[in-house]
């Protein structure tokens, strides 16, 4: 009997060791750059423009504009934007899938219980006649041996999916921030053009007044006054399209902030200074710039997940091995179950 138990234990330990070392399917390796492509592209090595800096780009890159109002708008959009909240919810869901996959690699337990009521008659033996209640309780334990690595590949696929969703979240975050900066810049640029156009209209009105006065004095002809009026009308006609452009930018900004289109910050109507970066733009080296792109990271992680699923599909061709056991008890009282 001892020999049989020892043999069973040996088989169990061996199976566990094999399960920890074996996984069918291809092992994922990140795609390598072609041999002729260096770590830093030639364009970045040869570029010596003072407009760029090899320093890494900060996470809050919009602060390079040194505009407190813009900083507040971006931070507000990152908190309330609907697309960003959807991406965050998807990321939490994928992380929950990873936790579930990892939980399957451990011991699974289950508890069950029940109660039954029966009536017996007095036949002179056993229990006396009457109604009796019976309580049942049991515990079950099971463990799946990951002999061919199916659980391992499942965890790898789930983790890669979560990483891809994290990259998608970063992409959504960058997109929201960039759209806010773009809408804010468009609104301020339109405001600056409106200020210039309005000033031009005022100057032309003064010029027309002088022309009409000179015409009455005989210094100018009626044709000169007509030309001045036509130029004034042309300048006045250029203002409404600029105002429409500013309103469109402000409406877009309001939507990015999770507001109704007309509920944009009122102070933006007075913005006439276009935000600019007054320092060298930090971009890092070429390799860092590529690694920073979330769409590239998302594609690479999607490839890793697809590779892991090849292993899952291969593992499904093999039988699965699980060890299990259960223990139960029956009593007529709760105290008797313990």
Feature map (PLM): residue ranges:
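Small/polar (Gly/Ser/Thr/Ala-rich) solvent-exposed segments
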Residues: 85, 105-131, 142-171, 190-193, ...
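Long hydrophobic segments that form regular secondary structure
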Residues: 298-318
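Hydrophobic, lipid-facing positions within transmembrane beta-strands of outer-membrane proteins
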Residues: 133-141, 183, 285
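Acidic, Gly/Ser/Thr-rich repeat motifs that build Ca2+-stabilized beta-propeller blades
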Residues: 94-101
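Extracytoplasmic/secreted envelope proteins and their assembly/folding machinery
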Residues: 71-74, 88, 98, 184, ...
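Periplasmic alpha-helical coiled-coil/stalk elements that build and connect Gram-negative outer-membrane
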Residues: 151, 167-285
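Terminal intrinsically disordered/low-complexity segments used for targeting and assembly
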Residues: 2-79, 135, 155, 159, ...
């Amino acid at each position: 009997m001892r020999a049989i138990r020892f043999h069973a234990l040996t088989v169990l330990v061996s199976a566990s060791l094999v399960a920890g070392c074996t996984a069918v399917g291809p092992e994922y390796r990140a795609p390598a750059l072609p041999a002729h492509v260096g770590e830093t592209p030639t364009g970045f090595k040869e570029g010596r423009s003072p407009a760029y800096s090899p320093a890494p780009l900060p996470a809050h890159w919009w602060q390079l504009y040194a505009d407190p109002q813009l900083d507040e708008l971006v931070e507000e959009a990152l908190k309330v934007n609907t697309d960003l909240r959807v991406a965050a919810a998807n990321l939490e869901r994928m992380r929950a899938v990873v936790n579930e996959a990892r939980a399957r690699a451990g011991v699974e337990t289950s508890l069950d219980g029940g109660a039954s009521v029966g009536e017996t008659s007095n036949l002179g033996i056993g229990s006396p006649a009457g109604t009796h209640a019976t309580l049942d309780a049991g515990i079950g334990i099971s463990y799946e041996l990951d002999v061919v690595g199916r659980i391992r590949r499942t965890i790898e696929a789930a983790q890669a999916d979560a990483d891809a969703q994290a990259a998608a979240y970063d992409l959504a975050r960058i997109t929201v921030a960039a759209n806010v900066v773009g809408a804010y810049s468009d609104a301020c640029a339109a405001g600056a053009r409106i200020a210039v156009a309005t000033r031009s209209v005022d100057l032309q009105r003064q010029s027309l007044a002088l022309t009409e006065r000179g015409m009455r004095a005989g210094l100018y002809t009626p044709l000169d006054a007509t030309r001045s009026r036509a130029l004034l009308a042309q300048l006045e006609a250029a203002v409404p399209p600029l105002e429409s452009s500013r309103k469109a930018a402000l409406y877009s900004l309001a939507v990015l902030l999770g507001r109704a289109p007309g509920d944009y910050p009122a102070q933006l109507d007075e913005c006439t200074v276009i935000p600019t970066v007054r320092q060298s733009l930090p971009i890092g080296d070429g390799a860092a710039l590529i690694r920073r792109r979330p769409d590239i990271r998302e594609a690479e992680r999607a490839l890793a997940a697809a590779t892991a699923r090849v292993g899952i599909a291969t593992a499904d061709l093999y039988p699965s091995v699980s060890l299990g056991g259960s223990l139960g008890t029956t009593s007529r009282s709760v105290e008797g179950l313990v």
